Amino acid sequence: MELVTNFVSGVVLTKHQQQTRMLLLKRADGGYWCQVAGSIEKSESAWQAFLRELYEETQVSPYELYSADYLQQFYNFHSDQIFVAAGFVAYCEPDTQVVLNHEHTDYRWCTLEEALELVPFPNQRKFYQHVWQYFVAQNPALELKLESSTVHFRDIY
């Protein structure tokens, strides 16, 4: 069994009609709902990989990025691998347009309750509840914020 640690995952948040919503994507392979996720390439940091994956999958550019202070873990029985993914939280503007690539067939901006109903895996639900508790119900810890002067969002993709 292999431990895979070159993986990232993140929740994208926005406001819609005064309500916080998160972006869910429907996978082309499998047809299930999920958050943005993907592999870290050799020359990237985890946060760079998340921003690249977010842009590749949706063409969304966030205005703020945080470490979620959360590691998402799961076992893939098909490949007999354990995945450990660094978690991120991205904030984007309310009028953000989503343009899907070939990996997804649909998207939705969901409330937490809607997301918990749509996703198939308990680990996803735990991640979303963590994000809501620490990034929606209260202001996120400033220590978790990746400063835009350091990150240079637009230079990543």
List the predicted regions and their residue ranges.
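Short connector loops at helix/strand junctions that flank enzyme active sites
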Residues: 5-7, 35, 83-85
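Short secondary-structure boundary/capping segments
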Residues: 2, 25, 80, 98-100
